Swiss-Prot record:
This protein's GO CC annotations: host cell endoplasmic reticulum membrane; membrane
Compositionally biased spans, kind Low complexity: 29-40
Spans within the Cytoplasmic topological domain: 65-121
Bias (Polar residues) ranges: 7-19
Coiled-coil portions: none
Entry keyword set: Host endoplasmic reticulum, Host membrane, Membrane, Transmembrane, Transmembrane helix, Transport, Viral movement protein
GO BP annotation list: transport of virus in host, cell to cell
Protein known as: Movement protein TGBp3
Region named Disordered: 1-40
Functional summary from the UniProt entry: Plays a role in viral cell-to-cell propagation, by facilitating genome transport to neighboring plant cells through plasmosdesmata. May induce the formation of granular vesicles derived from the Endoplasmic reticulum, which align on actin filaments.
Source organism per UniProt: Plantago asiatica mosaic potexvirus (P1AMV)
Regions of this protein lying in the Lumenal compartment: 1-43
Family: Belongs to the Tymovirales TGBp3 protein family.
């Protein structure tokens, strides 16, 4: 007759059966380095929209006239309006008949609205 021994009735863990504990696996989404560096399809459209807006803003800025300096040269007169830091040589070379230094000084006294400074002589 066989009597149960302590090894047969043991409620403790069996060393051969529990050498590697088995844990339940929880599946969590993990980002691999390759998937985190590639943009999603939605981000492509955001980048495209940003590029289009930036290009449109740049084109609008470049096509807007700048009222800083206006020079009109005709056969008889030269009109300089606005704040134009122009050397006398450039004005003399630009006018077909040439200008005297006195006329250039009159141009340099021109206010941004086109009127002349009043000089006391």
């Amino acid at each position: 007759m066989h009597y149960p021994t302590e090894a047969d009735t043991s409620t403790g863990p069996n060393p051969s059966a529990t050498s590697a504990p088995v844990r339940p696996r929880h599946v969590t989404p993990s980002l691999s380095p390759s998937s985190s560096s590639s943009p999603s399809p939605d981000s492509f459209y955001y980048f495209l929209a940003a590029a289009v807006i930036l290009t449109a803003a740049l084109a609008a800025a470049l096509l807007t006239p700048n009222p800083g300096c206006t020079i009109v040269i005709t056969g008889h007169t030269t009109i300089i309006q606005g704040s134009c830091p122009i050397p006398p040589q450039l004005v003399l070379a630009a006018h077909p008949r040439g200008l005297s230094l006195e006329q250039y000084l009159k141009f340099t006294n021109t206010l941004p609205d086109g009127s002349q400074h009043r000089s006391h002589r």
